[in-house]
Amino acid sequence: MAGMAPEGSQFDAKHYDSKMQELLHQGDNEEFFTSYDEVFESFDDMGLQENLLRGIYAYGFEKPSAIQQRGIVPFCKGLDVIQQAQSGTGKTATFCSGILQQLDYGLVECQSLVLAPTRELAQQIEKVMRALGDYLGVKVHACVGGTSVREDQRILASGVHVVVGTPGRVFDMLRRQSLRPDHIKMFVLDEADEMLSRGFKDQIYDIFQLLPPKIQVGVFSATMPPEALEITRKFMNKPVRILVKRDELTLEGIKQFYVNVEKEDWKLDTLCDLYETLAITQSVIFVNTRRKVDWLTDKMRSRDHTVSATHGDMDQNTRDIIMREFRSGSSRVLITTDLLARGIDVQQVSLVINYDLPTQPENYLHRIGRSGRFGRKGVAINFVTRDDERMLFDIQRFYNVTIEELPANVADLL
C-alpha cells in the first residue's frame, strides 16, 4: 500500500536521520523541502473524484494552500507522507482529502484511522471530514474519552469508513475488538509533536502493533522533535517529506505586540482596560492553568464583563455547549488553556491575548495560530512581567520575529 521497500533492502536509520536534518537546513528561500516535486495550483488538477471536489468547494476552499498544493496528491497515491506546517495552513483538509479520495464507499468497514491529541481536535477533524465528504456519503465517527463507551460500540458496530480519535479511547476500542482493524489501510497521526509531549507514545506504538502490516502512514505536525522523527523511522516506508523551516512557522498577517505589566497582580486591570476592544471582535485569552481559567473568569464577571471559559476539567457536554456559543458569536470572549488551543478553529477570532505567556515557545504558535487563519488578519497581544522577559526573547528568536510594544490605537488594528 505504501510503496514497499525493495526486497532485502535494509533501512539505514542513521542515514535517514542525517538526511532528515539536511532537509531541514538546506536552501533559505524554499518554502517547503520535499522529495515530491509536483505542485498543483488548483484542486481541479489533482485528479480528485467529482463528489470530493464538490465537498471541498462547498466547504469554502477556493484555492489550495501551499501544503495542500504539495501534500494532497502524494497522499492520494498511497505514499507515506510526513507533512510539517503550522496551524491554520490547511493540514487537516490535506489528509482528509487524501483519505476521502481512497475510501471504498461500498465497504462499510473502518478503512482509515486518525489519531489526535485532544477530544476537541478529534471532533474538529471529524467535522471537516464529514463536511468534505458530504457528497460521498462518508461515515465518520470520533472515538474520544469523556463520551459513552457503549455508544461508541453501537456506532462502530453499525459500520463507519473513518474513525478519528484520541489514543486512549481508540486503543480501548481495538482491545475490546469493537473497532476491527482488518480493513484499515490508512493511519494518520495529527499534531504528532503534541501527542508525544502528552505521553501518548506507548499507546501509539500499541495501536500500531494491532494494525495490518501494509498500511499507509501520514504524520502531520507543526514541529518535528526527535521523538517524532523516531516514529517516522519505525512506522513509515520511504516517506515523502514536505517540511517547513522552523523560522517560517509563525503565521503571516498576524500583528504581534507585548504589554509591559510590572507585576502579575496588574494583569487583571490591564485586561479590563482592553475589554471594550476585546468585545468589538471575538477574542481568545490564554492562561497557563485550569485553576487560573476559573479565577480569571470569576474576576472578569465580578467586574461585569461577559466572558465564557473552557478547560479540561469541565465535562465534555459543557465544553461543547460553550464552544458552540463561541462559534456562533453569541459569546465574544473565551478564556482557556493550551490544552484546547489546537481545537479552537473559530473563523471569526481576530484577537488573541496571552494573559500568561506559554511555558514553551512551540505553544505560542498554536495559540496565535487561531487568529488570522488562511490569510485572515489577526492581532496577538502578550502580557509580559519581568519574569516573562526571557520567554518573550526566546519566542522571538524561535520564530525569527520581532514583537513590538502595543500602540495606543489597538482598536484600529482589528
Curated annotation (Swiss-Prot):
Catalytic activity: ATP + H2O = ADP + phosphate + H(+)
Keywords associated with the record: ATP-binding, Cytoplasm, Helicase, Hydrolase, Initiation factor, Nucleotide-binding, Nucleus, Protein biosynthesis, RNA-binding
Molecular functions per Gene Ontology: ATP binding; ATP hydrolysis activity; RNA binding; RNA helicase activity; translation initiation factor activity
Domain of life the protein comes from: Eukaryota
Short sequence motif named DEAD box, residue ranges: 190-193
Assembly behavior: eIF4F is a multi-subunit complex, the composition of which varies with external and internal environmental conditions. It is composed of at least EIF4A, EIF4E and EIF4G. Interacts with DRM2 (via UBA domains).
Annotated compartments: Cytoplasm; Nucleus
GO biological process annotation, one example: cytoplasmic translational initiation
Species of provenance: Oryza sativa subsp. japonica (Rice)
Main localization (coarse): cytoplasm
Pfam families: DEAD, Helicase_C
PROSITE patterns listed in its UniProt record: DEAD_ATP_HELICASE (PS00039), HELICASE_ATP_BIND_1 (PS51192), HELICASE_CTER (PS51194), Q_MOTIF (PS51195)
Domain topic, free-text comment: The Q motif is unique to and characteristic of the DEAD box family of RNA helicases and controls ATP binding and hydrolysis.
EC primary class: hydrolase
Residue stretches making up the Helicase ATP-binding domain: 72-242
Protein name (database record): Eukaryotic initiation factor 4A-3
Gene3D superfamilies documented for this protein: P-loop containing nucleotide triphosphate hydrolases
Domain Helicase C-terminal: 253-414
This protein's GO CC annotations: cytoplasm; cytoplasmic stress granule; nucleus
Binding site for ATP: 85-92
The organism's taxonomic lineage, starting at the top: Eukaryota, Viridiplantae, Streptophyta, Embryophyta, Tracheophyta
EC number, UniProt record: 3.6.4.13
Extent of the signal sequence: none
Family, per entry: Belongs to the DEAD box helicase family. eIF4A subfamily.
Chain's role: ATP-dependent RNA helicase which is a subunit of the eIF4F complex involved in cap recognition and is required for mRNA binding to ribosome. In the current model of translation initiation, eIF4A unwinds RNA secondary structures in the 5'-UTR of mRNAs which is necessary to allow efficient binding of the small ribosomal subunit, and subsequent scanning for the initiator codon.
